[in-house]
Amino acid sequence: MEQSSFIKINPADSVVVCLRPMKKGETIEVDGKTITLLQDTPAGHKVLINDVAEGTDILKYGYPIGHAKTDLKAGEWVNENNLKTNLAGTLEYTYNPVDEQLNIAKENRTFKGYVRKNGEVGVRNEVWVVPTVGCVNGVAEKLVELLKKETGCEGIDAIHAWHHNFGCSQLSGDHENTRKVLRDICLHPNAGAVLVLSLGCENNQPDDFMKMLGDYDHDRIKLLVTQKVEGDELEEGMKILRNLYAQAKEDKREDVPVSKLRVGLKCGGSDGFSGITANPLVGEFSDWLVAQGGTSILTEVPEMFGAETILMNRCENKELFDKTVHLINDFKEYFLSHGEPVGENPSPGNKAGGISTLEDKALGCTQKCGRAPVSGVLQYGDRLETTGLNLLSAPGNDLVAATALASSGCQLVLFTTGRGTPFGTFVPTMKISTNSNLAKNKPNWIDFNAGALVEGVEMKDLVSKFIDKIIAVASGEEARNEYNGYREISIFKNGVTL
């Protein structure tokens, strides 16, 4: 059997990953040993290469992904039926810093972006309607419909309302999270102009909310409180939107250094190829971007469980290490406070694709942030302050996490997927497939195919093409989610609803 039928990711691994469906009785040559497969094993799934006793750790990516539930023989298909997570509660961690040099040259690349008055740069120039409360979602959608009909979006990239269910009937942390995310959307550089649309009586009081925006551009961000309008709020809203649209229409793209790019890193519908193709590809891009002076952000904190020490030891200093420890343990406490196990993460789709435990998922997931040092740690709803690689507190849920990334200031999100997903958040959400079958079957969803990495294409060649693609999207080329009109936001909720 040819070597290309499987891959051993790390020399220390006790499993190999099948690159194609393999049949019971087939043989593979691994480290000078002939191993006979004991079961039919799907592509992306793991085959044990040594006999192990019950309780023995199984290694992949060079780290434990769980332990054997029973004695296992070489050639066995390793999956959730015979592999158990090692994850439990919160842990105490020790800072053992790792200083790894990237040694990536600066290339002085540029993209065509929109430079805002405050110096931030957008990759889109859109007019947005942001409801302060879900009660006015319908009004917001109607205003967008009217403005689109009247203008045809001529001279700008899009007109959109970001509807949500919150802004009232919330308390403490949930209420503050909603306000922070809505604030972040209003201040996002991809918006050329924003109408903040309020009902008037909601918990998220309009005057207080506008104060949260700080020193904002009063010409480009306007407030309309619908309960204060005598008569037709649509007529009043259109007056404001016409003015905002006229201003945004004057904005033009200009050459901007790639150091101004801020990119979110996300995965969803992951499979056994995620940690082999798409995530390492995104990791290579992330390192390249950081070396250019740009910024990348990794979130999905629960999907760091099992790989967290790798990130902790890459923190630039002890203060960042301590923040990362809190990031991890706070999310574990969140799980435990709801009576949920911290390791119960892989979805049915993950398992069908070859991911058996949360450690298995996490070690693949964190490939997306490459090898760069961690230079910043953000709480949910915080806006970026530091260039380089940042970690952001948010759950693994695709819509919530992608919204959180965009809210922090990312102009676009890189989203790797092995199973496929059409959704997008309020910034361009590029889908990178882990396998070529997905790219072939869902070209309307997928922006870039990383599956070529197991088909003979060299990483350096694919990274070069990937960089070109990202710069093209940053310069105005539509991501597939934009072309399809699949754009939405989702805000994290933890507490009661009144």
Q: Which residue ranges define each predicted feature?
A:
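Metallocofactor- and cofactor-centric catalytic cores in central/energy metabolism, strongly enriched
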Residues: 2-412, 419-422, 427-498
